[in-house]
Amino acid sequence: MPAVDKLLLEEALQDSPQARSLLSVFEEDAGTLTDYTNQLLQAMQRVYGAQNEMCLATQQLSRQLLAYEKQNFALGKGDEEVISTLHYFSKVMDELNGLHTELAKQLADTMVLPVIQFREKDLTEVSTLKDLFGLASSEHDLSMAKYSRLPKKKENEKAKTEIVKEVAAARRKQHLSSLQYYCALNALQYRKRAAMMEPLIGFAHGQINFFKRGAEMFSKSMDGFLSSVKDMVQSIQVELEAEADKMRVSQQELLSVSESVYTPDIDVATAQINRNLIQKTGYLNLRNKTGLVTTTWERLYFFTQGGNLMCQPRGAVAGGLIQDLDNCSVMAVDCEDRRYCFQISTPSGKPGIILQAESRKEYEEWICAVNNISRQIYLTDNPEAVAIKLNQTALQAVTPITSFGKKQESSCSSQNIKNSDIEDDNIVPKATASIPETEELIAPGTPIQFDIVLPATEFLDQNRGGRRTNPFGETEDGSFPEAEDSLLQQMFIVRFLGSMAVKTDSTAEVIYEAMRQVLAARAIHNIFRMTESHLMVTSQTLRLIDPQTQVSRACFELTSVTQFAAHQENKRLVGFVIRVPESTGEESLSTYIFESNSEGEKICYAINLGKEIIEVQKDPEALARLMLSVPLTNDGKYVLLNDQADDTGGSPSENRGAESEA
């Protein structure tokens, strides 16, 4: 090894300018070495950090490979080979992670640590000795300055002796510090060469050991496994290329179709219309009412399933029932100056939903398909043959009607005329009950009204020529004169669930069946909105009052309530049947279902008490006995178990105030 430069220790005592000049060269070299060592340490720490990160990365990769099996892939067919392969690779990653961890430890011990020790021990020692040498030189200079100022005359032997001793001590101290400093600088020239080599030897040994153990781990069995995995990937790639070629050919064929596929009604004359359909799918626009006179149209995907018309919004997993098509009727209509509109009506003739197709072909095929399905020919042995016989009927249905008046003329039921303006708010539930008892209570396919507000009935009844009684409209004045004179006033908080027509009021079973159908329809159609009202029971009427405005929403004569009952299991459900005379002289029956804050039996008790009061008002003695059997308020009205305060959530005085305002 070539000789190194050295400082002569013999020149330390003399401290000549030449010695100082040579010392400055060594100091500059030590400073450069310090800067380089710091940069070298940063680079080696980066290598160690990268190796440490490699350990963490391989560990995370191993866990992620095992997590593939736990992923709930929607399309996981044929993943067994992939899962087993990933499990094997995860095991390999764990072994490889052990090698990386060991390599990181070796790099820390044999590469990074020696450089740190060299910097902290040798370079720091040189820096410290440099500072001590500087202090000793300064002290020597000060003592020599004192010694030089000794006077030539009047010498003070005592002072001279002290200064001489001080100079000797300072010179001895400087000599000692310079010798130590020179030795450290000379040793640094040797140590820096070793300090540069030793970390690299550790790095090389660590890498060699890592690769050797890696080669041992990746044995012939590993080579065979990798070969089989490579063959599997190549076979998948071949299948992918073949499938890609097929898809390119199919894409070219599909794109080579005529422009009529993209443009609706581009050539109406040549459109081939299939009138024998017993099932149909496609996008239609559905008309929805958003207010008294406002509507919106929503584009949805419709399809038929047996005798049901289903709708599936984009992004939904499955479709929902829109309308039962059995025994329904379909006809073209003019609606809001839109083309290709048709309406599906209920079996009783009441208008139902209005749909719009995108083309003439889709328009006619939908009408024909619904017309065929409505006659339940999908249940026959040869539905298509039966559908051909019904084509003429379907063609007649395609002819649009120009007004609701013409539609009313073609209807043979007065019930159709009465409800033609309000059926856009109705949803026709599927008649699921097949036992005769249920059909005797409620006709299959009877529409359900979910909103207690029916604005369409606020107009004049043209059949009677006068103002029509509005069972669900708001009263013109806010006072209830009959409530002031009534012996009974009881208030309950209720929420309207639905109402529907029934066939009989001879049994409470009709109310239970109506409850079942209303709740089932709400569940099927995801209807959660309910109108909250105050139900005031008097000895004359049942009145529904808006809790905010205290305006009457509906009023029923208590004598018209022919049946009332609470649910046998859900005690908060209550319903009653109303008998209403029609303009034709006949009477109609409707049941109304509510959910109450209190038990439904309390409402039934109040209604029953009101009807008893009506009966005994003709007999003063019976009325007196009844008044004695029931507690009264200060103004002579009946109180029922403090229900008023419990239901309304306020004080009795507040409730009486609400009644008087109503």
Swiss-Prot record:
Keyword Cell cycle recorded: yes
Positions of region (Disordered): 642-662
Membrane-protein topology: Peripheral membrane protein
One Gene Ontology biological process: protein import into nucleus
Tissue occurrence: Expressed in insulin-target tissues including skeletal muscle, liver, fat, and brain. Highly expressed in kidney and pancreas. Abundantly expressed in the ventromedial hypothalamus (VMH), barely detectable in the arcuate nucleus (ARC) and paraventricular nucleus (PVN) of the hypothalamus. Also expressed in pancreatic beta-cells.
Effect of gene knockout: Mice have normal food intake, body weight, and fasting glucose and insulin levels. Mice are viable and grow normally to adulthood. Appl1 and Appl2 double knockout mice are viable and grossly normal with regard to reproductive potential and postnatal growth. Reduced survival rate after injection of LPS.
UniProt domain PID: residue ranges: 486-635
InterPro entries the UniProt entry points to: AH/BAR_dom_sf, BAR_APPL2, BAR_dom, DP13A/B, PH-like_dom_sf, PH_domain, PH_DP13A/B, PTB/PI_dom
Molecular function per GO: phosphatidylinositol binding; phosphatidylserine binding; protein homodimerization activity; protein-containing complex binding; small GTPase binding
Subcellular location, record wording: Early endosome membrane; Nucleus; Cell membrane; Endosome membrane
Pfam families per the UniProt record, alphabetical: BAR_3 (PF16746), PH (PF00169), PID (PF00640)
Keywords of this entry: Cell cycle, Cell membrane, Cell projection, Cytoplasm, Cytoplasmic vesicle, Endosome, Membrane, Nucleus
Keyword Cell cycle: yes
Residue intervals of the PH domain: 277-375
Annotated BAR domain residues: 3-268
Induction and repression of expression: Decreases steadily in response to lipopolysaccharide (LPS).
Record note on quaternary structure: Homodimer. Homotetramer. Binds RAB5A/Rab5 through an N-terminal domain. This interaction is essential for its recruitment to endosomal membranes as well as its role in cell proliferation. Binds subunits of the NuRD/MeCP1 complex. Interacts with FSHR; interaction is independent of follicle stimulating hormone stimulation. Interacts with APPL1; the interaction is decreased by adiponectin in a time-dependent manner.
Annotated domain remarks: The BAR domain is necessary and sufficient for mediating homotypic and heterotypic interactions; associates with cytoplasmic membrane structures; mediates interaction with TBC1D1 and ADIPOR1. The PH and PID domains mediate phosphoinositide binding. The PID domain mediates phosphatidylserine binding and allows localization to cytosolic membrane structures and nucleus. The PH domain allows localization to the plasma membrane, cytosolic vesicles and distinct nuclear and perinuclear structures and is sufficient for RUVBL2 interaction.
Protein name in the entry: DCC-interacting protein 13-beta
Taxon lineage: Eukaryota, Metazoa, Chordata, Craniata, Vertebrata
